[in-house]
Structure formats: C-alpha cells, structure tokens
Amino acid sequence: METNLQQVKNSSQTFSEKQNPKQEASPSPISSTCSSPSHDFSFTISLQPLSSSSKHISPTLRSPSKTTSSYQQTDPFAVDLSPADEIFFHGHLLPLHLLSHLPVSPRTSTGSYNDGFTLPVKDILPDQPTNNNNNTENAITNISTEAKDDNTEDKAEGEIRVKTKPIKSFSLFGLSKWRKGFESNEREQEQQQQKIKKPMSLDLSHAVKKYIRMLFQKRGNGTQFWNRRQTSSYSFSSSLMGPNGNSKTMINGSYNKRDLIRGRRGELFSAPASMRTSPTNSGHLRVSTAGLSSSSGSTSSSSSDSTMEELQAAIQAAIAHCKNSSAVDRDDKVKDS
C-alpha cells in the first residue's frame, strides 16, 4: 500500500513538471505541497472494485513513465492532473469524482483568480525568486490603476448625466403642478397683505372709538348742564297786601291756596307805592344761582318733581301779581283825579 502511495506522488510530480515547464521560475502549488510535511495529506484507500472515477485515473497511475503525448491520447473523461490547484487545496486532496466532470483549462499565471482554487500569498515559501515579487507588485499596481480608472469613469458619467438632463415634455400633470404652485404663491401673498392690513384696521378702529368717546363725553357734559339748569331751584320774593293792610310774602314761590284764590278774586294784592318801589317788595322776580352751583346730587327724581311744582306756583303768582298791580294803578289814578 505504501508503494502505491509513493507511485501516485511521483507520477503527479513528473506529470506537472513535463506539462508546465514554464512554472519552474515561479514556485508552483505542487512544489509547495510537496515541500510541506506529510502529515497534511490524508488518503483513504478502499478494497472495493474500481469505480468510474478510479477507472479514469488508472491509466495515469499505472504508466507514470509515459510522455505527454500518451497522456493527451487518453480518455477525454479522465482527470488532468497537470494543474495541481484543482486537485490540492491548502495541502488537502480534493475528491476526484467531482473534478472529473469539470473542463480542464491550461493555467497561464498563478496570480489569476478565475482559474479554480489558488493558494493565498501567505502560503508562498520565502525561497521564491525576485521575479515573483515583481509580478505580484505589478499585479497590485494594475489593480489599483484599474480601480482609479473605474472611479474616474463613474465621475465622468455622473457629470454627463447632470449636464444632459432630459427636458420634461409638456403634460397635464405638469400644468396641475404649476397651477398648485401658483395658487400657493397667491395664498402666501394674500396672507402677507392681510397681516399688513390688520394693524392698520386696528389703528383705525382705535381712533374711531376714541372719537366716539370724546363726542359722548362732550354730549354728557351738555346734558349735565341742561339737567342742572332744569333742576335749579328758584327763589321768588314778593309781598301781597291784604284788605286789612296785612302783608303776605311769597318765598320760594309758595303761597297759600287761599291767598291765591283771593288774589284771583281781586281781594288781595294791594300795596302802597313805597312798597312797590322797594326792590325787596316790589314784586320783581329774582333768580338765585344757588341751583346752578349745586352738586349733581340734586338731580334726583324727587327734587325734580318739587321744583316743577314750585315753578308752576311761582308763574301763577307772578301773573296774579301783575294783574293786581295794574288794578292798583288804576285805583290810584282815579283817586288823584
């Protein structure tokens, strides 16, 4: 069993060296796997009859000394062991029955990511030549330049899109949006005008209210003056001479009812000339201004009623006094004659 395992390893090495002579400059994954310790590999051998996958692999394993031409004339379904990355991954053998259906592609470079499984940069041995370092650096620089080119292309496309915006076609939806915007602008303007008009209207209303108050105050003062004039108290002083020579005076326009009735009949109201010429007893009416200087407390209803009655009585007494004085003058003229 051990001899069979060694034969498998030797055949894979010789086959890879013959088919890929260009990979000698750069360390291949197979060399790295071969240089790795043997405990990384695990093989399972079964004593069952050969399967389809083992049948395909058997010609390569039984005749390791054959040339590359003989390997090329083998069954097309056989697995090509030349690219070791397709068989070994991180030092472990992959199942061959899955790889038998995959198309085999010749490997041109070890740094490409599209050719199946590859070893990472960490697994490369330190004994590699300077050419490999140069190749990796060139690949990194190429990737960075490609990324920069992609960024510049994206920026240029974005600028072109911004510059060449498609002109919107005329549609009813556009009209509706335009109308809505126009109406909103009109509403804003109206609101601003209303805000400006409100303080003006408030000022006008305030001024009108002030003017009306002033008018009412003036009118109130006038009404108070007329009320005072109407409710002012009057004092009258007059003297009446009875038939017996008794004088009866009227103060504040008050006479007895009997005296007034007698005066109407002509029984009263006889006085000498000396008394007639005196200002106190001449019968002249004198209005006292006490009522004009009185306070507003005299404007009650009871005082107004009493003053009206006094005025009426005073007027009647004045009329009677005039009649009596004229009758007395006539009598004097008759006596003198």
Curated annotation (Swiss-Prot):
Coiled coil: none
Modification after translation (UniProt): Phosphorylated on Tyr-211 in response to brassinosteroid perception, leading to its inactivation: once phosphorylated, displaced into the cytosol where it is inactive.
InterPro entries linked: BKI1/MAKR1/3/4 (IPR039620)
BP-aspect Gene Ontology terms: brassinosteroid mediated signaling pathway; lipid metabolic process; negative regulation of brassinosteroid biosynthetic process
Keyword Lipid metabolism: yes
Complexes and interactors: Interacts (via C-terminus) with BRI1 (via kinase domain).
Domain comment in the entry: The c-terminal part (253-337) is necessary and sufficient for the interaction with BRI1.
Low complexity composition-biased segments: 26-38, 288-310
Annotated compartments: Cell membrane; Cytoplasm
Phosphotyrosine, modified sites: Y211
Tissue expression notes: Expressed in leaves, petioles, shoot apices, hypocotyls, roots and flowers.
Protein name as it appears in the record: BRI1 kinase inhibitor 1
Keywords: Brassinosteroid signaling pathway, Cell membrane, Cytoplasm, Lipid metabolism, Membrane, Phosphoprotein
Additional detail: BRI1 is not required for BKI1 association with the plasma membrane, but the BRI1 kinase activity is necessary for the membrane release.
Effect of substituting Y211F: Loss of cytosolic localization. No dissociation from the membrane upon brassinosteroid treatment
UniProt biased composition (Polar residues): 1-25
Gene Ontology CC terms: cytosol; plasma membrane
Function: Negative regulator of brassinosteroid signaling. When associated to the membrane, limits the interaction of BRI1 with BAK1 by binding to the kinase-inactive form of BRI1.
Molecular functions (GO terms): protein heterodimerization activity; protein kinase inhibitor activity
Region (Disordered): 1-38, 51-72, 270-310
